[in-house]
C-alpha cells in the first residue's frame, strides 16, 4: 500500500483586517505549493471576511470559514483552528500557522518549507515544527535570545518558531501536546507552544537560508546586540499581555524565581527609573504593569484588556 504524501493545512486567524486578509489569500493563491486545506478563523464574525474567503477560494484545495462568537485573540483563534483541523488530518500532515497581516513572501516559500520539514523529519523523527526562524529562551532572565547572524545556515535548533515565520507543526505532535494555549489571548503564543513541545521531547528547527534572506531583506543583519533598553516607549495594550504571559509561562514551567525577577525589574524597576524623564508615560506603565503582574501571578488569563480598535497596520 502506497502512503499518501503529508498534506498542508493552513490556519489563518483574523480580526477586522479585510484588506490584509485579501492580500494574504492572494499570496497563497500564487504559491507553487498550494495548501491542501485552509481554515480561516474570524474573531470578528465579519460577513466581509466570509465574502473575501469565497472570492479567494483558490488559495487552497479546500477552504473553510469559522466565525467565532467573540474575539479570542490570535492565540485563541489558532487554538480553535488547530482543534478543528486535526479532526480531518493525518499524523504526518503539517499545520501551517499564518498571519493575516504578513503574506508569505515569494511564491516558493511554502514549497521550500515543506521540503525542509520532510528532510528534518527524516533526519530527526522527533521534529515537531519547522519554520523560517524563531529564537531561544533564556530561563535565567525570562527573555528571548536572538540567534546570531553567523548561525543562519542549514537547520538551526530552536526553542520556538516565531510569529510571522510560517511555523509548520506536525499533526502528531499537536495531538500529543494539544494546540496553542488560548488563555494567553495574545503575545508569546509561539514561545509557550514551542517550550511545551520541547518539554515533551520534540525538536524545532529554523531554515538558515530562508532566515538569512528574511533578515537581509528587513535590514536586520548585524544587529546581534539584544541588550534590553532602559527607555520606555509609549504604552500599548500588547505590552500588558507580553508581561502577563511571560510571568504565567515562567510559573507554568516551574521558574517562579525568574518570574519574580521579571516582576520586580521589568514590571516595576524600569518604569520607576523613567519617572523623572517621562512621568506620565512611566505612571501608565506602572499602573498597567502592576495589573499584568497581578494577573500573571493569579492566573487571570484570557481577554482581560481590550485591544486597540484600529491597528496601525490597518489600511
In which residue ranges do the predicted regions lie?
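Conserved donor NDP-sugar-binding/catalytic core segment of glycosyltransferases
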Residues: 103, 107-143
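A short, conserved alpha-helix in the catalytic core of glycosyltransferases
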Residues: 173, 177-178, 183-211
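A recurrent flexible, glycine/aromatic-enriched loop bordering the glycosyltransferase active site
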Residues: 151-169, 230-233
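Non-catalytic, C-terminal membrane-associated alpha-helical segments of glycosyltransferases
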Residues: 251-315
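Short, well-formed alpha-helical segments that are part of the catalytic scaffolds
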Residues: 17-30
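A conserved acidic beta->alpha catalytic loop
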Residues: 42-51, 70, 102-103
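Short beta-strand-to-loop acidic/aromatic patch adjacent to the donor-nucleotide binding site
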Residues: 91-101
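Glycine-rich, basic loop-to-helix element that forms the pyrophosphate-binding segment
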Residues: 68-88
Amino acid at each position: 500500500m502506497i502512503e499518501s504524501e503529508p498534506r498542508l493545512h493552513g490556519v489563518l486567524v483574523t480580526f477586522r483586517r479585510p484588506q490584509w486578509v485579501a492580500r494574504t489569500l492572494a499570496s497563497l493563491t500564487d504559491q507553487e505549493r498550494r495548501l491542501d486545506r485552509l481554515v480561516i478563523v474570524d474573531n470578528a464574525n465579519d460577513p466581509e471576511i466570509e465574502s473575501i474567503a469565497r472570492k479567494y477560494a483558490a488559495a487552497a484545495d479546500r477552504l473553510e470559514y469559522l466565525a467565532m462568537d467573540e474575539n479570542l485573540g490570535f492565540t485563541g483563534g489558532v487554538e480553535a483552528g488547530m482543534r478543528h483541523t486535526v479532526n480531518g488530518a493525518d499524523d504526518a500532515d503539517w499545520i501551517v500557522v499564518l498571519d493575516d497581516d504578513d503574506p508569505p513572501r515569494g511564491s516558493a516559500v511554502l514549497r521550500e518549507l515543506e521540503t525542509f520539514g520532510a528532510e528534518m523529519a527524516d533526519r530527526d523523527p522527533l521534529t515537531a515544527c519547522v519554520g523560517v526562524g524563531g529564537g531561544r529562551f533564556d530561563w535565567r532572565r525570562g527573555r528571548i535570545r536572538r540567534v546570531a547572524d553567523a548561525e543562519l545556515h542549514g537547520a538551526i535548533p530552536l526553542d520556538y518558531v516565531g510569529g510571522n515565520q510560517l511555523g509548520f507543526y506536525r499533526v502528531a505532535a499537536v495531538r500529543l501536546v494539544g494546540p496553542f494555549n488560548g488563555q494567553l489571548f495574545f503575545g508569546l503564543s509561539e514561545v509557550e507552544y514551542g517550550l511545551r513541545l520541547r518539554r515533551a521531547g520534540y525538536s524545532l528547527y529554523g531554515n538558515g537560508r530562508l532566515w538569512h534572506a528574511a533578515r537581509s531583506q528587513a535590514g536586520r543583519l548585524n544587529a546581534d546586540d539584544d541588550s534590553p533598553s532602559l527607555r520606555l516607549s509609549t504604552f500599548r495594550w500588547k505590552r500588558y499581555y507580553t508581561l502577563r504571559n511571560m510571568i504565567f509561562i515562567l510559573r507554568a514551567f516551574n521558574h517562579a524565581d525568574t518570574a519574580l525577577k521579571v516582576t520586580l525589574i521589568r514590571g516595576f524597576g524600569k518604569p520607576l527609573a523613567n519617572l523623572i524623564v517621562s512621568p506620565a508615560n512611566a505612571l501608565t506603565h506602572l499602573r498597567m504593569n502592576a495589573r499584568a503582574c497581578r494577573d500573571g501571578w493569579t492566573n487571570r488569563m484570557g481577554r482581560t484588556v481590550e485591544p486597540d480598535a484600529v491597528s496601525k497596520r490597518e489600511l
